[in-house]
């Protein structure tokens, strides 16, 4: 989403994100030379956030509101580069990036949270999922990590085949067209098979993402 565009407004931050930022700054002041263990740090922040009163949280909620107003204001004036959307939508048949272990965990647990807390906002649902994930043991996370690793491996194979297919198609349009009539038929068969596989892969990944 416009990662390469330096003029794109910085994304808005939630109240919890401001709180985590404050925690990180406090940690840096207290331990300037020590590195942060992010899993441990996230868990401590989450536990601390849970015990805070509404009054203590209000400071961060005010920061989030003003940041949202800043973001909305900047987005109204923001014009994305013309080539930005074209670059994104140029390859609709390209294999989709595989979901992470955390994303798979969210897909599985989000419906349960929604049914238990129907009024919960998207941001609060995401925060709750983050807290749940940080509370999982390494053993509990393992099935999601294994599935994510398999999907990543599959994606790497698919993207390699997709790129190879793109190169072979460019080659066909090149000057060697009249002499390669026999060779032309062989890659086409392979490409048809690859296209079928790509379609199946996309369906599987769509199901996972849902």
From Swiss-Prot:
Predominant localisation class: nucleus
Gene3D superfamilies, sorted: High mobility group box domain
One example of a Gene Ontology biological process annotation: defense response to Gram-positive bacterium
Family annotation (InterPro entries): HMG_box_dom, HMG_box_dom_sf, HMG_boxA_CS, HMGB
Region of interest called Required for chemotactic activity, as start-end residue ranges on this chain: 165-180
Start-end of DNA-binding region: 9-79, 95-163
Recorded GO CC terms: chromatin; condensed chromosome; cytoplasm; extracellular space; nucleus; perinuclear region of cytoplasm; protein-containing complex
Superkingdom as given in the UniProt entry: Eukaryota
Residue numbers bearing the Phosphoserine modification: 35, 100
Residue positions, PTM N6-acetyllysine: 3, 30, 43, 90, 114, 141
Biased composition (Acidic residues): 187-210
Xref: CDD domains: HMG-box_HMGB_rpt1, HMG-box_HMGB_rpt2
GO MF annotation, one: transcription coactivator activity
Comment field on protein domains: Both, HMG box 1 and HMG box 2, show antimicrobial activity.
Record PANTHER family: HIGH MOBILITY GROUP PROTEIN B2, HIGH MOBILITY GROUP PROTEIN DSP1
Assembly: Interacts with POU2F2, POU2F1 and POU3F1. Component of the RAG complex composed of core components RAG1 and RAG2, and associated component HMGB1 or HMGB2. Component of the SET complex, composed of at least ANP32A, APEX1, HMGB2, NME1, SET and TREX1. Directly interacts with SET. Interacts with LEF1.
Main function: Multifunctional protein with various roles in different cellular compartments. May act in a redox sensitive manner. In the nucleus is an abundant chromatin-associated non-histone protein involved in transcription, chromatin remodeling and V(D)J recombination and probably other processes. Binds DNA with a preference to non-canonical DNA structures such as single-stranded DNA.
Protein name: High mobility group protein B2
Organism of provenance: Rattus norvegicus
